[in-house]
Amino acid sequence: MIIGYFLNTKDYYNLFIWKKRVLLLKIISQNTTNYGIQVPSDTILRINLAWCSSVKQLKDILEDHKNNSIFLDLPIKRIKPPNNKYTLDDLIPIISSSNQIKYFAISNVESPDDLEDYIEKIPTNIVLVPKIESPTAILNISEIVNVIPTDKKILMLDHDDLFAKILKNGEPVDNFKIYIQKLVDYCDSNKVILLRTIGVMFSDEEKRISD
């Protein structure tokens, strides 16, 4: 299986050669740039639109990182703050005109129907990345992957939200590992890239990209 990692730390190059697995994606969070950490040109910059307060601000970020490929992450049905205040339709002109944007993640995907609008509107050269955040999504994983229109298939796992959904559903805590293993096995068998978060950056001062 090919696994990509989201990294929030500066010292990450030594993490990419692990056993016999070759990692194709090096993705770093936009929030690291608020602390003067430089994003290497061969690294993909992930822009979580929950932390981007306007379309203009997104344009500014793209302008500041012309040499990087971009991974946009659009929160859908997000309850916890912060949250974006614009729609997919607001983003389409930017997405369609930018050669930097290579990936577009959609949160809370639980069925193929959740991707329908994005498949219709997002340019076909951009890889759609369903975010897997619930047991329902994992149970429907084959159907979800089958509708991704690009040859490259990528999924993004949110461990915290998956665990929260398991607790909310009243399921045994042990199911957490079972669901993750089911997802990993599926990706392994079907040559699907699975993005998982490793590394956290801590600071005594919060600097949000929307400040």
Residues covered by each model-derived region:
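Expand to "…catalyze enediolate/carbanion chemistry for C-C bond making/breaking, isomerization
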Residues: 2-211
